[in-house]
């Protein structure tokens, strides 16, 4: 009987908590959305599967060595850690002390746990290498740059203003998060508010990069919100676009885009990087990788490298990025009131960004002879190319001969640049406080 009891106690089911059960269901929901509904499957599928692995009881695949030590509840080992942190020798007190400790102290405690015989889980290792270092989002940005054509933006530089206007959703959401905190509804710190705000840029890699730097404890919820709402762009944007434009405005036909020379396409990423990075060095990592990828594409002299970055490399990194995000889909981090706030603020951010882009297009039309169809303003959010396709679709509803896709790609690409710059602004000023 003792051996049977030991066997039963070793089963994961015997240790399954309510929080883990809920997170397993959430992970299965993400898998269903990815497979059945095709909602951002390239990211939601590995994120969902990573969530499943993270919430298997007793497996510890998403736990660091220190988290494994705390989960083991060995009184002697807890006393050693508590003595180093000058706190009470219980798990709750140790976690609170670690949250307030400097990164160097946290690393010391992690190394101490390793010395005691604990090892980090495989997903925790993925997270440390892919997101903790910031490498994975940067490599993906390089791949996005290699797949981006700046032609529509260069042919109509005014659309850069539409992409810039759409970033208003980011900063409005930061204020929204701080307002919730001010009124005591949901507690958000300034770094957390900044990380949540970047959802409004509709740029998954940027959201993950900034969250990893400013609010790693919210990364799972922010990434899920960002990619879920990106998939819902065709549902979120059209009602806002129709509400802010008249039938006459939606029928505006834009002039044919000029042909952009190869020299312009080669010079643009170099000039863009120098101009922005010299003024805002914190934006250099994201924008630098983006411009480097684009230069490989446009130069035409490294086709093998460009092809690798666009296909094999970005696909491999996407797998590890998704699994790493899934490592943060654990009950104690995800099942918090903050998650509801993130989901609410995320959809508001998308709405504000869409509206700001449309209104900026209308403003430009007041002082311009060559009219811009306001519908392309909504493409200023950097969900490439979905937002541009939505602009084209809504335009075709009003005028079946009015093809706006290439025109909308201008603000769409500008939105990618804008979100990278916004992330740089957040890093510079939030980390400085």
Swiss-Prot record:
The chain crosses the membrane at residues 16-36, 42-62, 122-142, 168-188, 190-210, 216-236, 266-286, 311-331, 340-360, 413-433. InterPro entries: OadB_MmdB (IPR005661). Its EC number is 7.2.4.2. Its cofactor is Na(+). One of its GO terms (biological process) is sodium ion transport. Heterotrimer of an alpha, a beta and a gamma subunit. This is Oxaloacetate decarboxylase beta chain 2. It comes from Salmonella typhi. The lineage of its organism: Bacteria, Pseudomonadati, Pseudomonadota, Gammaproteobacteria, Enterobacterales. The gene is oadB2.
